[in-house]
Amino acid sequence: GLGDVYKRQPKEWLDALTPLGTDENKKFIENAPYLIAIFEKKFSVSKNKKIKNYYVKESVGIATGILITCLHFSGLAMLTHTPSPMTFLNKILKRPSNEKPFVLLIVGRPDKDVKVPKFAKQKKKFEEITSIF
């Protein structure tokens, strides 16, 4: 279970999560009306021949960003979840081995009692994340 995942993680990683108030309890997954599993497809198979797909991470990342934007503009809330390891998704969703889980999106409307941690709302200034040449 997820508790086992947390037991295997380095203390530094667990300490980094502390301000977010996150732990092995993921009730939001059970309560969300939609779970969207996004996979990257490393290669395709055609006539028993393996065909490499290029720029997979870039393409899947861009497509995921567009989907997240659409979800937000549709009035839905979402968060990303990347349990480690994610290969269990291949098994439960019956996906082939040439597909690798990329991210799990938990989608729905926020619980009426939801509290977003103050730490999660702290954003860097534009100047801190941008270099203009």
Residue ranges and their predicted role:
Residues I36, S44-V45, K49-I92:
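Small-aliphatic-rich amphipathic alpha-helix that forms the alpha element of a beta-alpha
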Residues V103-F133:
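C-terminal helix-cap and adjacent tail motif
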Residues L2-Y6:
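Short, small-residue-biased leader/transition segments that mark boundaries at the very start
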Residues L89-L104:
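Short, electropositive alpha-helical surface patch
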Residues K27-N31:
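Extracellular/periplasmic catalytic domains that process cell-envelope and extracellular macromolecules
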